[in-house]
Amino acid sequence: MILKSFLLGNLLSLCMKIINSVVGVGLYYGFLTTFSIGPSYLFLLRARVMEEGTEKEVSATTGFITGQLMMFISIYYAPLHLALDRPHTITVLVLPYLLFHFFWNNHKHFFDYGSTTRNSMRNLSIQCVFLNNLIFQLFNHFILPSSTLARLVNIYMFRCNNKMLFVTSSFVGWLIGHIFFMKWVGLVLFWIRQNHSIRSNVLIRSNKYLVSELRNSMARIFSILLFITCVYYLGRIPSPIVTKKLKETSETEERGESAEETDVEIETTSETKGTKQEQEASTEEDPSLCSEEKEDPDKLDGNQGYQENWKLEILKDKDLFWFEKPLVTLLFDYKRWNRPLRYIKNDRFEKTVRNEMSQYFFHTCPSDGKKRISFTYPPSLSTFGEIIQRKMSLYTTDKLLSPEDPYNHWVYTNEQKRHNLSNEFINRIEALDRGTLTLDVLEKSTRLCNNENEQEFFPKIYDPFLNGPYRGTTKKVYSRSIMDDSITWTEDSIEMVWINKIHDIFPNDYREFEQKMDLFNGESLSTDIGHSLTSINKFAGESAPNLNLKGLALLAEQRRLDSENQTKCLKFLSDVVTTDPNDQTIQNKYIGIEEIGKKVPRWSYKLTDHLEEQEKENEEESTEDHGIRSRKAKRVVIYTDNDQNTNTYTSTSTNSDQAEELALIRYSQQSDFRRDLIKGSMRAQRRKTVTWEMFQANVHSPLFLDRIDKTFFFSFDISGMMNLIFRNWVGKGPEFKTSDSEEKEAKEKEKTKEEKKEENERIAIAETWDTIIFAQAIRGSMLVTQSILRKYIVLPSLIIAKNLGRMLLFQFPEWYEDWKEWNREMHVKCTYNGVQLSETEFPKDWLTDGIQIKILFPFCLKPWHRSKLRSHHRDRMKKKGKKENFCFLTVWGMETELPFGSSRKRPSFFEPICKELEKKIRKVKKKCFLVLRALGERTKWFLRVLKEKTRWILKTVLFIKRIIKEFAKVNPILLFGLRKVYEPNENRKDSITNNKINHESIIRIRSVDWTNYSLTEKKMKDLADRTTTIRNKIERITKDKRKIFLTPDIKISPNETGCDDKRSESQKHIWQISKRRSARLIRKWHYFMKSFIERIYMDIFLCTINIPRRNAHLFLESTKKIIDKDIYNDERNKEGIDETNQNAIHFISTIKKSLSNISNNKSQIYCDLSSLSQAYVFYNLLQIQVINKYYLRFVLQYRGAYLFLKDRIKDHFGTRGILDAKSRPKKPPNSGMNEWKNWLRGHYQYNLSQTRWSRLVPQKWRNRVNQRRTIQNKDSKKDSYEKDQFIHYEKQNNYVVNSLPNKKEKFKKHYRYDLLSHKYIHYEDRKDSYIYGSPLQVNVNGDREIPYNYNTPKPESFYVPRGIAISDYLGEESIIDTGKNPDRKYLEWRILNFFLRKNIDIETWIDIDTGTNINKNAKTGTNDYQIIDKKDLFYLPIHQEINPSNQKQGFFFDWMGMNEEMLYRPISNLEPWFFSEFVLLYDAYKIKPWIIPIKLLIFNLNGNENISENKNINRNQKKDLRLSSNQKEYLELENRNQEEKEQLGQGNLGSDPRNRQKDLEKDYAESDIKKRRKKRQSKSNKEAELNFFLKRYLLFQLRWDDPLNQRMINNIKVYCLLLRLINPKEIAISSIQRGEMRLDVMLIQKDLTLTELIKRGILIIEPVRLSIKWDGQWIMYQTIGISLVHKNKYQTNRICREKKYVDENSFDRSIAQHGKVLVNGDENNYALLVPENIPSPRRRRELRILICLNSENGNVVDRNSVFFNGNNVRNCVQFLDEDKHFDTDINKFIQFKLFLCPNYRLEDLACMNRYWFDTNNGSRFSMSRIHMYPRFRIS
């Protein structure tokens, strides 16, 4: 058995080895390459098929194989690769060769001069066959690339060591595959030749010569096939033969731009092809000459344009004349965008950064003291190294590059570094001991800054200190005094000489190139060298130093290298290099080095797309063509404004200066295959796309098929199927009745679906017309002819015919009416989309763009016109149904409701005539028959009456007798007794007793669903009313019956009467009692059920809690329950309500759904207990002052439960005496500030600013949660908190019910933890006077505080002073804005209203509280703000509405209460591209959030001001909540915008410190005004304005409200028409009647400003989510987003100053990274400083890693005496201000603080893995255990 398994295991491992071996993989790849069939196979087949003899077959095969072998070898042999891979050489060879080939095939006889030679090898044709196969095998990869082979090889290339073995094996594999293929081809051919069925085919037999013909013309067929394949391949790839040159921008511009380099990106969407991906790698630049050899792996794929870039760069020289330029540069534009990248435009500067470099560059470099291959090696450095190697002898380079023992050297340098770092660290700590200011001890991180006064930082991408040593620009160094102090003057000069020597390494003529911007993609060589020198120490076995730009010396780097090292290295270099003695003059030139750093290679041209081209057309007569292929679009002019006011709009010849057009852009609905590609880029390399629908709006890559919702062949509507099946099962039972509303909804849905479907069909038709060539012209001309035919030929002839017919039939002709109607019909020419122009004017380019013809008031031929009087009412009814009185003309002359819709039925002319005839005939018939029928019937009737009379008399006599008998039998009193029961009782109470219940008290206990309650009450009343009415009716009926049946004959004896009276009395009594009971039962049923269920569950629960198995789960639930009860205990004691109602039962989660209405109480604690954390439960336990429920202690003491508790929680409970029954104190101490809060207090750097947080937390989700909150019962003023039930349980998904927790669940959980942490922090003693107490506590005065709104991110918006009761504060509305999140944005732009309207100078307003009165106390604060009161701002009315008496108080709290937290640095320089005021406000808000009153940050939904402002004209349109309906007309808006812009420009910008902003804004506005004056606006200026809002770099996005869009468009259509008509009134009125035009949208007021639009909800301004690329370090510190709250709530001064004016004067020094430590009154006392935070993150990481790496002695931690000096440790206490700052014991606090100070941090490990080791796998990651310092002991 063992033997078997052993053998099997061996066999397996052997197989695995074979499979994974180089040979195995090579064979596999080789076999695969067989399938990359290219055109070269054609020749091979040709030789076989044409049967030209075995020699040719053999030569073809050998040629084929030789070619393939060459290909395989060229992969690894660089010279061959270069020779074959030069795209130009190949091109030059191929063209003549192809020509020759076709010529050869078509004129054979030229060459058949001596084929009779005996040696067949000398036969020219056989040699040609060989050559054909060989050459085409080579072409197969370069001219006609099939990338399969290259990709497959690339995959394996860097994996195997034995490359030749791999090559051979893959070749062998290919050979095997090829042999199989050829054998198969041979078999097929043989079968065809042998197959008799083919031969005996009738056709072939009839034509005897067909086969021979075929064989003769085979050569021609093959050449045609070859030609087709070549053309096909070349079509897929732009040939590199002659390329289109794009217009370059001039050099001066280029220089200007490089000064203002700002962040730009090109999104690379091209496929990753092996290792060839042009994304930006860190320091990579375009390699120079000899990088070619380095890069050969990247050259496998034949992207001809791709490689030419570097080669030809050198040849480009501006000084040459055109004929001196080599042929290549004339023919090729080597600066093409060869890769199909997406071009991302950035209008702020000219050109985009070019990143056409390989993603990886492989090269060996010493790492960890050993030589390793690095894949992120800077190519420029390797190039430089090679150049140097050529100049030096091999011996010296070896000596230079290898120290004695590289590993020891590395260890030594690391030791040194570690030593220095730890010394510095210790010094800093000692300085702390000496009592230095904490801020001075912290290591500052340096940032470059351009402008000291304005805190204008370098963008992070370009800042070398923050982002590695690349991409920095520095000032030019001219004077030596500026040089860094570390290098003396003499060293300086020596350095310069060395650098000159290094220059001499390169050929002389390079120096001219240095001045050219274009060299190496516009990157000067000196830069390259300077750059390489900084990294040259890599040769010396060290990691690359960081180029330090503060000390501007070339090679100064503070910590990494001593200058001695450098001098040695440089001296050596300069000695080895031989300088040319004649070159002295040149050397002198270079004493001042011009610049350090890298010039970012940019593209040499700026591309535009089609739209921009059109915009530019009029401004400057630019001839350049657009370079980006954007989506097909058509410019549709909808309105032309001519100055001459000509009425005929036909004259297009008017000067374009005068005519101003308004155009819309229409995109075709087809898939966009252009996808913004750059012209000339290689299409074939773009990601492949497919279309699988007839009509598909967007092209999709097959990669994303699974993401697309329902493509019909993939998805399967499972739920739908289930429903169907289910319905079939249940179908036999009773059907559920759907309510009317549901039915209506279903119908609506169906209808909309249908409409959508029809619309799609219409669009598809429109698109097909658009795609077919000349279709538009044909269609347009047909439409026009149809229109003319209809109007002037068909209709008039019909009218004439009709009237002639009438005359013949002796009727009055109706000439006048008919001609009037005919005259009314208008044929309006419309654009292709249906925008109306006018009757006479054709749309521009209508033959190409298409046209529609709209018929207004279409003429309909009627046989007669009814008189007005007769049909007035009826017609009006019809009109209501018909509504729209227009149609579009189709190509066949029919009418259709919508363009491309199905043609509608026209009312028939003869139908009414036929109807009328039918009626007449019917009348005549009736008259004839009536007479006859009447006679017959009379006689019959007379006879019948006689018979019946006699019978009836007999019957009645008998009947009366029978009745008298019956009456004698019956007891008559019953008849009346019944009536008596129903007789109304005078003293009867109302049918349902109205026991008043105290609403307040019930809500206190649990907020009952009062809306439901009132509903039931109403229902009961209705019932009562109904019963009384029914009773009355019955009485009336019985009375009537009594009258009928009472006969005087009957006598009633008195005894009987008495008996019956009793009976009726008792009946009545029973009835009333039962009635009363049932009413009471109905009323109390709700509570009865509730208490009943609660009791049952309490019993069950108390039993089950003893069962150990369920202990853990139930434990949580019970604690939760107890908490709930105890928190509400106080209230319950106040309102004495029976015990049954106390018990909350909503912890049983499974039953939640079914009992949703019952358990709807207290849902502020809204979580599923199944997913609650222990922390949350225990947090709530801590809130309880006295734990008085015995069985909880039982649970806690039960051993099973004990295991589940965390130790810390156990200890905590132990101290409180909860876990131990005996030592349980009467009242546990108030926990006050718990530990968590202390921890967080200490970590100041986790103080996350609001704006940042609001970006990090998912916005939509926050809104979603907030919308769940519902207000129930608005009439009660005080209980907003209880009523504000966060989530209805119906909506909640329970883990128990849905076992799969979905995304929302996770979100909720995340949210819950946030909430919990906030509660932890903000819970404190009452005496602490935090703005709100624990969210679950009851306030002293019984009034709830304002709810925290469950918005962790921004508590500010609800800080309200404790003293004021909520009901007063909020006025009538219980809580403003339930549906919308109050912190939906950073700032609700309602604020626009109050400053744009009054034109207030915002700057001064903001400056009120900046520098001057910083030290005033809160009182003066209020006075300051009264300045603003006087200005009558917009928000005052709201305050007055809320509560005039409290206004002042409210102000103070609003404004000062908002500085809940400090925001860090303001975002440095936001350019005000749009509405400078916004930016100022925005900045101000971020810096001092309390400036802008709360009221404006909340949408006042319930405010009277908003909704009552204007009555809605079309009620049915009012879909949107905020859409009060005076919307603004579209065109009007655009004109306003221009004026708006002017106003903003001229508006007083006040004391604006940022002058640059102001100037920019002014320029912006002025240029605009000038343009207006000149009247030389570009024709699409208005269009530009539309786009103006949508530009990428705007701070705000404007979007139209959705319901508006359609209405707007309809209006535009009508409006366009009205603008063109001479007398528009008639049509305007009719279109309003038809509902085509909305008056509310039409409403034009000249003074309707932007603010009005915003107020009415037409425009919604949203701040753009500013996408700032956070660097990792920043995110690291912002991760724990819990903000610290200061005790001194209103003391804002210090922090405020701290924040904005840190170190303002000396920005040259650094800005303290941790400068924003929260200060507590005194400057000296900071939160306890964690030693870890003293060094900057980078140094910290370095020190840790070095300590970790240097652990040879096994003693990982460097036990330095400083850390173990007890006194020093105790000194930590000096950082704490005991009485002021903390309520808890200091020792305990420090323990927690240090607990948070970890041994190592995860993010450091991650960074180490990536950056320090530069390795591919994380192998060393697992080994590193970093200890920076041990835990502190606390004595």
Swiss-Prot record:
Region (Disordered): 246-304, 735-759, 1535-1578
Subcellular location: Plastid, Chloroplast inner membrane
Keyword GTP-binding recorded: no
Transmembrane segments: 25-45, 64-84, 87-107, 124-144, 172-192, 221-241
GO cellular component term, pick one: chloroplast inner membrane
Domain of life, per lineage: Eukaryota
Compositionally biased intervals (Basic and acidic residues): 246-258, 1553-1569
GO biological process terms, semicolon-separated: protein transport
Coiled-coil positions: none
Pfam families per record: Ycf1
Compositionally biased residues, Acidic residues: 259-268
Topology in membrane: Multi-pass membrane protein
InterPro entries: TIC214
Disulphide-bridged cysteine pairs: none
Keywords for this protein: Chloroplast, Membrane, Plastid, Plastid inner membrane, Protein transport, Transmembrane, Transmembrane helix, Transport
Family the entry assigns: Belongs to the TIC214 family.
Protein's job: Involved in protein precursor import into chloroplasts. May be part of an intermediate translocation complex acting as a protein-conducting channel at the inner envelope.
Quaternary structure, from the entry: Part of the Tic complex.
Protein name: Protein TIC 214
